[in-house]
Structures are given as structure tokens and as C-alpha cells.
Amino acid sequence: MSLSLKRKDLMIVNMGPQHPSMHGVLRLIVTLDGEDVIDCEPILGYLHRGMEKIAENRSIIQYLPYVTRWDYLATMFTEAITVNAPEFLENIQIPQRASYIRVIMLELSRIASHLLWLGPFMADLGAQTPFFYIFRERELIYDLFEAATGMRMMHNYFRIGGVAADLPYGWMDKCLDFCDYFLQGVVEYQQLITQNPIFLERVEGVGFISGEEAVNWGLSGPMLRASGIQWDLRKIDPYESYNQFDWKVQWQKEGDSLARYLVRVGEMRESIKIIQQAVEKIPGGPYENLEARRFKKAKNPEWNDFEYRFLGKKPSPNFELSKQELYVRVEAPKGELGIYLVGDDSLFPWRWKIRPPGFINLQILPQLVKKMKLADIMTILGSIDIIMGEVDR
């Protein structure tokens, strides 16, 4: 005698929140039928700190230290968008040397962000070795940051009109040495990971997003380019001095987790190419504009002496934001990072709206994990690459 039993009981499981050094304070309420995912509901807001409201009660200079807490693995980009917004609003020109320094720092930060995505992503799939390899190269990048900015993380290096300090003597030679060394590391990653049959089984065809879906969901960054859309703001809407360098947009057409991995690995190669060109072509001249203009216009000649400029230097200048509005954006490692700024003839912004790429990209997660296995959730979530600091703001 055989009995056909049908189990209709569903299981609801909480995944997260985790420590910020791991997957962050993201909570997923997952409905399971055995190991099959029936539904997934992301719960956000555990890391909300009111960053937009804080901006409306601070001048841009006062607000700069806050922004490095959005995406704390790619802080140069949050600083860049924070100074770009008032620069565009008030038509402030920055020296060419400062623009090149910004590009170098941004691309180093992009590599560091992709490295710290790759290591934990592979660890989620069960491969621990790459996790230790990526920290080897990441430490070298942080050594370069420390030499130029004084900080390994949370650099507070960008300023309205330029950067806080020029590159120290010998820094560019060390940067070029790192570029040569890192290219060998990328080859090592690809030999270790890309053709690994176990890795391919876990990522190939998992988390598929078509090009049309990616556009309709408003995805950006590697999430968009891995679905066949060649959209990179450094090419489409150039900022800083990106239009002066020779490099290619990295994209794939498959739209799965493997394609997103390949896009990010390819971007690290292109970032090295941009850094090498910027270091070789960097012009002379000032690294900051507003301070130089202030000293030039100073009526008191004592303000130009050594003691004032180097020993008793006053804080960076503030200025009123005129009654205008604009939207500025940069191509961050995770996608389009934008700021909608509204000025009101005041030192403080009237409105400071942040467009974080991680928040937009995360919205498609429930659709991607439905009808997949429980183990695929970490693969898909890892391939999106989110930092909850910028998601919750």
C-alpha cells in the first residue's frame, strides 16, 4: 500500500541582519518550500542615519566627513559627487592637475571596491583562498591612499575646487609599480577562478537579468553592463578628465552572475589602464583653486606669508549656494551615484537628495531569487554588490 503525501507547509526563514563587515544589516524574510524559494522580502533601514537631512543643516565643507560613511569601501566616489555638485552649481573650474589626481584616486578606489567585492563573493560560494589574495593587493592600494591623504579609509581628500593636498614626492612611481604588479594579480585571479568548474556551476545561469529588465528596473553599473547594455557614465556623460584617456567599457551579454563577475574583473584591468595614462600625462600647476584665488584677492599682504599659509591656515572657504537646482552623477563601482542639489542663496543646501546605486539595484532581488534554491540567494545577493551604508543612508 502506497500513500501519496503532499506537503503544503511553507517555512519562513530570516536571513540577516549581519555585521557590517560581512553582508551588512540587510534582513531577508524568505519563504521556502523545502529548498525552493517561494518569496523574498528585503527589510531595509537598520543603518539609516539621516544623511540627507544632515546635509541640509551643514555647509558642504562641514558635510564632507559625513559622506565617506555612505559607501565606506569606495569613499572617494562619495567625496567626488559631494564636491562636484556645488562646483557645477556655481560653475567653479578646477585645475587640470587636480582633475588628474581625482581620476587616479577614483580608479584606485574602484579597484579596492571590486577587490573587496570579489573576496567575500567567493567566500560565499565556498572558496576561501581568493579572500586572502584580494587583501594582499588591497593593502597596497590603502598604502597609496595613506601616503597621499593620511588616511587608509574615510580619506576626506576632495575639496571644492580641487583636492586637499598634492601628491607627495615619489608617490607616482610607487603607483606605477603597483599597476604593474596588480595586472599579474588579475591574471592569477582568472586562472584560479574563471575556469573553475565548481565556481561555474554556482554562477552560470544564476540570477539572469535581460537587458530590457535591467533598463526597466533602473539598474546601473556592472548590473546593467552585464546584461548587454553598454552604459558607463565615464563615456556617456564624461566628468573630470575621463574623455582624455583611452579605455573600453566592459560589458557582457549573458546577464547572469558569471557575467557580473566578468564585468568587474574587466573593469579592474581598465582602471589600471586609466591610472597609468593619468600618471604619465599629469600636468603641473596648482592642485586646488579656491584657496589660490582667495590668497590672490587678499588685500592684507600678511595673509600670503609663510606663517599664515602653512602654520596657521584657516579652514576652507564657504560660499552661498545660489538659488538653482541640478542633478550630478558619477560612475561609482556599484553603479550611478547621483546628487540632486537645490540651492537657496544660503550656506546650506535646501535639498540634498542622494541617488545610491545599491538601493536601486537591490530592488530586483526578490524577482531574481524566486523559484531558485536557498543556496542561490547568497550567490545572487553577492553578485549585486551592495553596501548598506549607501542603501539606508
From Swiss-Prot:
Gene Ontology cellular component annotations, sorted alphabetically: chloroplast thylakoid membrane
Top-rank lineage group of the source organism: Eukaryota
Localization in the cell: Plastid, Chloroplast thylakoid membrane
Gene3D superfamilies: Cytochrome-c3 Hydrogenase, chain B
Recorded GO MF terms: NAD binding; oxidoreductase activity, acting on NAD(P)H, quinone or similar compound as acceptor; quinone binding
EC numbers on record: 7.1.1.-
Annotated catalysed reactions: a plastoquinone + NADH + (n+1) H(+)(in) = a plastoquinol + NAD(+) + n H(+)(out); a plastoquinone + NADPH + (n+1) H(+)(in) = a plastoquinol + NADP(+) + n H(+)(out)
Family per similarity comment: Belongs to the complex I 49 kDa subunit family.
Keyword Membrane: yes
Major enzyme class: translocase
Protein name: NAD(P)H-quinone oxidoreductase subunit H, chloroplastic
Self-association state and partner proteins as the record states: NDH is composed of at least 16 different subunits, 5 of which are encoded in the nucleus.
Main location: plastid
